[in-house]
Amino acid sequence: MKLSRYIILAGFVCYLFAQKAQATPSPIVAELMREAVNVDTKNLSALIQETTKNNPTIRAAHDRWVAETHVIPQARSLPDPVLIASYFTLDGNKGEEKVLQGLELLGGSQEIPFPGKLYKRWKIAKINASKMDAEYLAVTISIISQLKRKYYDLYFVNKSIEILKHNQALLEILEHKANEKYGSHHAPEQDVFRAKTELARFEMRLVSLQQEQQSLITDINNIVNRDLDINITTPHTLPITPFEHKAEELNDGIKQRSPHLNVRRKNAEKAKESIALNKMAYFADFELEAEHVKDKAIGAVGYQVVLKATLPLYFFDKQNKAVRESVARYHADLEDFQDTYQELGYRVQNAFLIIHRTNKLIKLLESSLLPQAKEALTSSQVAYRTGGVDFLTMLNNLLTLQENEVELEGEIVKHEKQITEIEEVLGIFL
């Protein structure tokens, strides 16, 4: 019973240790998670925190990073020594000859790589672990960016539904007034038909938006890795993230911070060190063997020390080709680095231009178009009662106001999604 308790306790301790190891992010990812707390939208901030803990893609990237950190001490370790033990006997025909009638041998051997090889392997392992850390951050920020885009899309859909329902209620009032005027022969019947047609179109759009709403909720829950039916709320108004960064500052940020570019950089560094390691393959590795020998029959004791060395005899087909291979891989990694830098630069520049465009459009909509559209609808409602304008003019003013309201929310969402694009490239929250 005591033994079984000890086994259970040991297993529980191992489980806790494994859970703790799995739950501990790398320092750069931990810094990103601390920044996530400052995201303006609290519900979105909570979703980000939950995603970084539960998303299987992020957890897999974390485990790959942890695995590579355990490779580092292995890379600088000597190969395991070999224990040698033997007993040798020879049945001779001559009874008086006792030589080799009971020879015992005990010793060991140790393989010793050429000086500098273990250091190079250790350095390559460190670079690879650093690369996996950058990849861990890149995966994390990419998943978070995907989550934020879906969340902003959900906000836009929710806001569109809210605007449509408000205008639908207003249109129902206008339809009632058109019915009254038609009943008193002050308006044509086509005004009533047009109102009913627009109400039906409102219903069609609401059905489509509600389906899109549920799809987005499912997508977000899938990213967070939880029950797909959990409801997700969005704020009544989405805060607009201030953006005062310059293009030069963002380009410098790509070189200094981008985890995607850092992965390529580490690949090139690893390939460069691999060239040096492959060049060291021209130098011999050694094996030192020491043995204690005892002949029990005659009581003789002796020692044997053997030094072995590998000879790169076939260097033309092996070492030469290995060096050329590593050089080619290094050049390929440099090209990948440049290609990634160009792609990231394009993404940031494009997002930068769209952000400035959305800022101008948001100001134009808020300061000019929306107030004018509201004023036009209000004045047309008053004029319609007195017969100053027809129903179609008033309906057109309502639809124009609705279009401007939806467009404003759409520009706000585009602004936030392009901020997210830059965040994904730089690996930080702006």
Per-region residue spans from a language model:
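Periplasmic alpha-helical coiled-coil/stalk elements that build and connect Gram-negative outer-membrane
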Residues: 2-3, 36, 136-255, 351-354, ...
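Bacterial N-terminal signal peptides
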Residues: 8-15
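A glycine-/polar-enriched beta->alpha junction
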Residues: 49-59, 66-81, 95, 106-123, ...
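Bacterial Sec-pathway N-terminal export signals of envelope proteins
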Residues: 21-82, 87, 112, 227-272, ...
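Amphipathic alpha-helical coiled-coil segments
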Residues: 60-72, 139, 143-164, 173, ...
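Small/polar, glycine/serine/threonine/aspartate-rich low-complexity segments that form flexible
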Residues: 25-41, 84-121, 233-244, 287-324
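Short, charged, amphipathic alpha-helical segments
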Residues: 123-126, 189-197, 391-399
